């Protein structure tokens, strides 16, 4: 490994290590009950902190991960010292926090120079190089959505003079606002102009004292960028401390267009399976996907979402903002409850697919396609009662959901947790309208990170099919049914992806599902200003089948729609095939549609 590569990897490791807690876990028995504590040494003093029972295993894994990273760091430092023994990296003793400046930032940014930039990068760039605004820039979002990478890309574009006026401060669990204030005063005296603070929400007192950044340092001409994964904490900070003195940029939502352009990955199925983070992409970002396995998916939900919410509530208004969730927090069940709500949303989605999406004509089409398959023709779906299997799966899922409810959640708990998930941009609501009964309005809950939903649904179906109730099915039969169900899940997820991205791209229009007593339009885009609408069917298929657009040419459905939503200007089937016109219906490739939004 070359010297600059060693230095770059060392800087990466330091950043990763800072995000994990130091120390070890110890157990104490008090009044016959086991209590767990994290113990570590800081400033030559031993410290310890209580760990709720539900968090012990996660903290244990984090400590082990830190230990492995520290071992790698130690090895690389030895290699670096051998390759350049006369040069030593010295941290200024004047600083309390981990401050990097000047040439070290060039090394820190070296590995991202060839990475493609996210679309929101330009907003960060404009703030850094635009006129001073007496505001701070907040770059926030869930883990692995490109926040720190964008900051490093800013460093990569700076010349040497600009880098000398720039610092990057990596906040750790031990840092406080007083520590940062101390260092910022020193940096201000040195003429530093650009300050980037990463993971600022790790500071326990950040939410209550964040006005320091805008009122003192930004007002004196510093350009300050705050970043971190604790999205909810930043929203609380804006409401409590910063008000109109901050610019917010949220990185959590990654549309298909960016998934393809930034990561260089093509295909809607890849987006369905892995979309939602910047951690899949070969040479561009990390090697493996966050949602490649159920274990990594569950860990992401636990650390990036559940603990995000709990940490923010604990640090906000001196723990006075838990509302009805206080009892769960006091019983150390809040993290588990949040995990459960996310899982419930995805299990309900899977249940809907099993209940609603398995129509006889679809099963017949699948069986026919398998029989005519050129490579591996089979009549396996003719020999299996898929409808009965599906019904058994649905019943089994309902039973499992009840058994797994270890934490009792009432409607108030679930509603409050879902509100926080909405604030994190993890979930979005899509309206479902009804005709001719216009008084009925329901909603779909869409997960903005499709890979998370698919991973949980996929694991659920695979585990259900292993139940003894399906012992009579051979392995090939189970695999065929599994593939069939997963294709249905992909089809429904494709609908949700198109609905969400169309809604986000058209804030001045209404985007919804329109249901009739029999059948529905998968998507309607209604423009109230033009008194007109477009109607869509969304299919996971790459084939053109007349049955797909039967609702679009239904005169009664179209007449009811035009009476309520104005003239229908276009009828479209979005699918995975080539663009073409079929009997007045525009068949458009869904990937092309999403990229052009």
Positions of PLM-derived features:
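Conserved catalytic cores of phosphodiester-cleaving nucleases, focusing on short active-site segments
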Residues: 502, 521-546
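Domain-level recognition of nuclease-like catalytic cores that cleave nucleotide substrates
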Residues: 569-597
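N-terminal pre-Walker A segment at the start of P-loop NTPase domains
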Residues: 85-128
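Interdomain motor-coupling "hinge/lid" segment immediately C-terminal to the ATP-binding subdomain
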Residues: 236-379
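Sensor-1/coupling segment of RecA-like P-loop NTPase cores
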Residues: 216-238
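Accessory nucleic acid-recognition modules appended to NTPase machines
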Residues: 311-521
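Conserved lysine of the Walker
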Residues: 147-148
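Conserved P-loop NTPase "ATPase switch" module shared by AAA+ and STAND
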Residues: 188-210
């Amino acid at each position: 490994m070359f010297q600059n590569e060693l230095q770059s990897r060392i800087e990466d490791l330091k950043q990763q290590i800072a995000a994990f807690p130091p120390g070890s876990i110890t157990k104490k028995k008090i009044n016959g009950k086991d209590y767990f504590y994290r113990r570590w040494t800081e400033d030559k003093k031993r410290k310890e902190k209580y760990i709720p029972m539900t968090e012990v295993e996660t903290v244990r894994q984090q400590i082990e991960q830190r230990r492995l990273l520290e071992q790698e760091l130690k090895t690389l430092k030895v290699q670096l010292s051998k390759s350049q023994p006369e040069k030593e990296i010295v941290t200024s003793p004047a600083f309390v926090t981990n401050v990097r400046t000047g040439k070290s930032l060039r090394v820190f940014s070296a590995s991202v120079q060839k990475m493609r930039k996210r679309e929101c990068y330009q907003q960060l760039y404009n703030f850094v190089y635009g006129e001073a605004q007496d505001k701070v820039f907040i770059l926030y979002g869930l883990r692995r959505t490109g926040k720190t990478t964008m900051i490093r890309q800013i460093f990569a574009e700076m010349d040497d003079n600009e880098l000398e006026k720039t610092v990057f401060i990596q906040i750790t669990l031990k840092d406080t606002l007083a520590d940062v204030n101390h260092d910022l005063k020193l940096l201000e005296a040195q003429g530093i102009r650009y300050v980037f603070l990463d993971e600022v929400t790790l500071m326990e007192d950040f939410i209550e004292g964040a006005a320091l950044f805008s009122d003192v340092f930004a007002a004196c001409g510093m350009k300050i960028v705050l970043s971190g994964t604790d999205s909810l904490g930043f929203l609380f900070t804006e409401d409590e401390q910063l008000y109109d003195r901050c610019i917010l940029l949220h990185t959590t939502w990654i549309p298909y267009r960016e998934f393809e352009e930034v990561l260089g990955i093509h295909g809607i199925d890849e987006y369905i399976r892995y979309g939602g983070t910047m951690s899949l992409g070969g040479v561009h970002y990390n090697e493996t996907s966050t949602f490649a396995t159920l274990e990594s998916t569950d860990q992401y939900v636990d650390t990036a979402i559940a603990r995000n919410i709990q940490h923010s509530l604990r640090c906000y208004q001196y723990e006075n903002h838990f509302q009805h969730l206080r009892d769960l927090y006091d019983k150390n069940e809040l993290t588990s409850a949040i995990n459960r709500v996310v899982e419930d949303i995805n299990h309900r989605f899977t249940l809907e697919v099993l209940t609603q999406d398995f129509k006889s004509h679809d099963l017949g089409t699948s069986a026919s396609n398998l029989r005519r398959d050129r490579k591996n023709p089979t009549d396996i779906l003719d020999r299996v009662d898929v409808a009965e299997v599906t019904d058994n799966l649905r019943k089994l899922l309902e039973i499992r959901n009840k058994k797994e409810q270890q934490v009792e959640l009432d409607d108030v708990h679930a509603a409050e947790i879902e509100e926080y998930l909405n604030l994190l941009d993890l979930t979005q609501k899509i309206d479902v309208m009804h005709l001719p009964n216009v008084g009925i309005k329901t909603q779909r809950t869409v997960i903005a990170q499709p890979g998370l939903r698919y991973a949980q649904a996929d694991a659920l179906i695979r585990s259900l099919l292993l139940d003894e109730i399906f012992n009579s099915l051979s392995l090939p039969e189970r695999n065929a049914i599994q593939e069939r169900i997963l294709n249905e899940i992909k089809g429904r997820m494709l609908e949700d992806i198109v609905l969400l991205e169309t809604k986000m791209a058209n804030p001045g229009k209404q985007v919804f599902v329109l249901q009739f007593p029999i059948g529905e339009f998968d998507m309607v885009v209604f423009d109230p200003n033009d008194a007109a609408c477009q109607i869509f069917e969304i299919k996971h298929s790459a084939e053109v089948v007349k049955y797909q657009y039967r609702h679009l040419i239904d005169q009664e459905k179209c007449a009811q729609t035009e009476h309520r939503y104005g003239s229908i200007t276009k009828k479209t089937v979005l699918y995975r095939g080539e663009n073409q016109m079929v009997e007045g219906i525009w068949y458009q490739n869904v990937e092309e549609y999403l990229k052009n939004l």
